[in-house]
């Protein structure tokens, strides 16, 4: 066990020579490909980061444009809705106005018809009253009178009846 703790200068010399030879061979054949691979990997990672940042920036730009478009579309929709509501209100008001005018015309026409029927009924009643009055007067008096006198008498009677009513 003592031999392991005691340094052997020959062994140390050959270990150093082997180590230096290993370093030389690694440097000559392995370090360049390893460093090249590491640099390539580093460049790829750097490029991927740059591409990701550009993609993120582009996405944010597109999002901002879409937000502006959405805002504009929303404003246009609100304006269209307001226009449609205004048009609907105008049409409703026009329909109400037309309906009122139509009902007023119908009422006026009905009043005219009622007045015409009333006048016609009054004429008929006046004629019947006149005929009855002439017949009654002729029966009471037992005399036949002329049509002018009959008409004047009937007019007076009808006027009296209308004034009393």
Swiss-Prot record:
One of its GO terms (molecular function) is proton-transporting ATPase activity, rotational mechanism. The keyword GTP-binding does not apply. SUPFAM superfamilies: F1F0 ATP synthase subunit B, membrane domain (SSF81573). It is a single-pass membrane protein. InterPro entries: ATP_synth_B-like_membr_sf, ATP_synth_b/b'su_bac/chlpt, ATP_synth_F0_bsu_bac, ATP_synthase_B_chain. The chain crosses the membrane at residues 11-31. It is found in: Cell membrane. Coiled coil: none annotated. GO terms for cellular component: plasma membrane; proton-transporting ATP synthase complex. The keyword Membrane applies. Its main location: membrane. Keywords: ATP synthesis, Cell membrane, CF(0), Hydrogen ion transport, Ion transport, Membrane, Transmembrane, Transmembrane helix, Transport. Pfam families: ATP-synt_B (PF00430). HAMAP family: ATP_synth_b_bprime (MF_01398). F-type ATPases have 2 components, F(1) - the catalytic core - and F(0) - the membrane proton channel. F(1) has five subunits: alpha(3), beta(3), gamma(1), delta(1), epsilon(1). F(0) has three main subunits: a(1), b(2) and c(10-14). The alpha and beta chains form an alternating ring which encloses part of the gamma chain. F(1) is attached to F(0) by a central stalk formed by the gamma and epsilon chains, while a peripheral stalk is formed by the delta and b chains. Belongs to the ATPase B chain family. F(1)F(0) ATP synthase produces ATP from ADP in the presence of a proton or sodium gradient. F-type ATPases consist of two structural domains, F(1) containing the extramembraneous catalytic core and F(0) containing the membrane proton channel, linked together by a central stalk and a peripheral stalk. During catalysis, ATP synthesis in the catalytic domain of F(1) is coupled via a rotary mechanism of the central stalk subunits to proton translocation. This is ATP synthase subunit b.
